[in-house]
Amino acid sequence: MIKVLSPAKINLGLWVLGRLPSGYHEILTLYQEIPFYDEIYIREGVLRVETNIGIPQEENLVYKGLREFERITGIEINYSIFIQKNIPPGAGLGGGSSNLAVVLKKVNELLGSPLSEEELRELVGSISADAPFFLLGKSAIGRGKGEVLEPVETEISGKITLVIPQVSSSTGRVYSSLREEHFVTPEYAEEKIQRIISGEVEEIENVLGDIARELYPEINEVYRFVEYLGFKPFVSGSGSTVYFFGGASEELKKAAKMRGWKVVELEL
């Protein structure tokens, strides 16, 4: 049996530039891998993908990716996958996309790399726009739907705390609430990202997070509580995770326990 770790990400800012000809929205974002992981176990056996939280196999991005891998390569996959989910679904942390990228990269290696890095990137990107980032990791600017990546080194370090309410945010619902007034120019977003890369985290903005706070009162409650504690809150992706730079106080931990929020303290 092989064990691999599947990291989460946060978005250190996300801007929507408009619509692509495909109908998808064009975004600009700064991805940051964080040391918060799902644990994935791979063993030889009948192709099966299971999780500890009961995600139906046919809905799991990993299963979809493995079936597509079989179709493209003509190779039958004889591996059973078990995913210990620590990263909540619908949290804006890219857990499912990370699982997809990590498993397909490992299975490709185990089978002698029938797919090139570019082919693997195209495969996972066809299933999830966030997935190609997890083949790269660390920090990267995401353009297009998020799949056109530019690796960068940021000046951001130190403690970061995630606060995750008990609500799963629907990315589709958030995107469908976008209006033209939410769009910004590429020049505006590029300038913001360069400032954030240099360590000016107060420049972080996320229009999807603003919409998620309107759609899901639970996210806004966390956001307002973090503000009350004196920190500047940020939303990752389309929610539901709210994060801030700093450690978790006893007051936050107590409030989180009462409200069922998950608190994760990390070091960047």
UniProtKB/Swiss-Prot annotation:
Protein EC: 2.7.1.148
A molecular function GO annotation: 4-(cytidine 5'-diphospho)-2-C-methyl-D-erythritol kinase activity
Gene3D superfamilies: 3.30.230.10, GHMP kinase, C-terminal domain
Record: active site: K9, D130
Pathway: Isoprenoid biosynthesis; isopentenyl diphosphate biosynthesis via DXP pathway; isopentenyl diphosphate from 1-deoxy-D-xylulose 5-phosphate: step 3/6
Claim: Transferase is one of the keywords in the record: yes
Any one Pfam family match given in the protein's UniProt record, by short name: GHMP_kinases_N
InterPro entries: GHMP_kinase_C_sf, GHMP_kinase_N_dom, IspE, Ribosomal_Su5_D2-typ_SF, Ribsml_uS5_D2-typ_fold_subgr
Catalytic activity from the UniProt record: 4-CDP-2-C-methyl-D-erythritol + ATP = 4-CDP-2-C-methyl-D-erythritol 2-phosphate + ADP + H(+)
Binding residue positions for ATP: P88, P89, G90, A91, G92, L93, G94, G95, G96, S97, S98
Biological processes annotated in GO: isopentenyl diphosphate biosynthetic process, methylerythritol 4-phosphate pathway; terpenoid biosynthetic process
KW Nucleotide-binding (keyword) present: yes
Keywords: ATP-binding, Isoprene biosynthesis, Kinase, Nucleotide-binding, Transferase
Annotated HAMAP family: IspE (MF_00061)
Function: Catalyzes the phosphorylation of the position 2 hydroxy group of 4-diphosphocytidyl-2C-methyl-D-erythritol.
Family assignment from sequence similarity: Belongs to the GHMP kinase family. IspE subfamily.
Protein's recorded name: 4-diphosphocytidyl-2-C-methyl-D-erythritol kinase
Encoding gene (name): ispE
